[in-house]
A protein has these predicted regions:
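Short, Lys/Arg-enriched, disordered terminal segments
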Residues: 1-3, 282-283
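N-terminal glycine-rich anion-binding loop in soluble enzyme alpha/beta folds
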Residues: 5-64
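Short beta-strand segments
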Residues: 7-8, 87-91, 117
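Mixed-charge interfacial surface used for oligomerization/domain docking
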Residues: 11-36, 93, 97-114, 121-283
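Acidic/glycine-enriched edge-of-secondary-structure segments
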Residues: 50-67, 195-209
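Glycine-rich phosphate- or other oxyanion-binding loops that anchor nucleotides, phosphorylated ligands
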Residues: 57-58, 64-91, 99-100, 146, ...
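Short beta->alpha junction loops
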Residues: 64, 117-119
């Protein structure tokens, strides 16, 4: 048994089979429609989220894990015999999950619970946990894994092409006028996670097809070596994600490029149809 338990917020979108194979523990964040709360990927699938969103007048909100839920998880891991816990969070700039985890760690065992701000989102965040869990299974200490995670945090990136501006408007990130003009002119923002973990529009492209091509160009310009894992992500747009995957595979034939769902928590802001690319350096 590994001495270090790896915990990921559910926003990491780690497939269930990977969670099981690597003994990763998941702390679930919820999406909220009115008074009804759903844990992402447990109580609500991406398909159900899109269907519910299409028939919902307002903007869904998100709910971070409760302190009670987080404390119970930590205590159960120590009861199982783990000596240390590393909890990898979605960017602290985008959710209160990181602060809640810090508070809970202080209450349970601050010396042996290490709360790590990934400063990123969705499966880019998930890869932090996947590679950390591999290190834990190899017998690495908590300090060794934390140093490894610092390296990943300095060498990762996430870009998303936003197809539908509705949620950006509902959430106040775009004015009604900006959203109307954007829709009329088919303006599609390219958003990037910044080094401090904020999510900002960095380019505006006319038509979604050209926005997807820009994602591919950015990935190509980066000239990723085989030390990097490259992935494609989407929310309800598998066809577009496969197109991006196919073109990236031609550029990077030695990389295994897989497709993952975007976190429902992120989809609340990014809206349906968004496609993203992300990469982390893992060795």
């Amino acid at each position: 048994m590994a001495k270090v338990a790896i915990v990921s917020d559910s926003t990491g979108c780690i497939p269930a089979e990977t969670v099981k194979a690597l003994d990763i523990y998941v702390n679930y964040i919820s999406v909220v429609f009115g008074t009804e709360s759903y844990r992402e990927f447990i109580d609500m699938s991406p398909e159900e989220f899109l269907e519910r969103s299409a028939n919902y007048n307002g903007l869904p909100t998100t709910s971070q894990p409760s302190p009670g839920q987080t404390i119970a998880l930590y205590e159960s891991l120590f009861e199982q015999g783990y000596e240390d816990i590393i909890h990898i969070n979605i960017s602290s700039q985008l959710s209160g999950s990181h602060q809640t985890a810090l508070t809970c760690a202080e209450m349970v065992n601050p010396e042996h619970i290490h709360v790590f701000d990934s400063r990123t989102v969705t499966y880019t965040q998930g890869m932090f946990a996947v590679y950390a869990a591999m290190k834990a299974k190899e017998g690495a200490s908590a300090q060794e894994i934390l140093e490894y995670l610092e390296m990943i945090r300095e060498n990762n990136q996430f870009y998303a092409a936003i197809n539908d501006l509705t949620n950006l408007r509902k959430g106040g990130r775009l004015s009604n006028v900006e959203a109307a003009l954007g829709s009329l002119l088919q303006i599609k923002p390219i958003c990037q996670i910044q080094p401090d973990g904020t999510f900002q529009a960095v380019e505006k492209i006319r038509t979604f097809k050209k926005a997807l091509k820009r994602l591919i160009e950015i990935s190509k310009e980066t000239q990723l070596t085989e030390d990097y894992q490259l992935v494609v992500m989407h929310i309800g747009n598998e066809e577009a994600a496969k197109t991006v995957q196919t073109e990236l595979q031609e550029i990077y034939p030695n990389h295994e490029i897989n497709i993952y769902s975007i976190s429902l928590v992120v989809a609340v802001h990014g809206g349906p149809g968004a496609v993203a690319v992300g990469w982390v350096k893992h060795k």
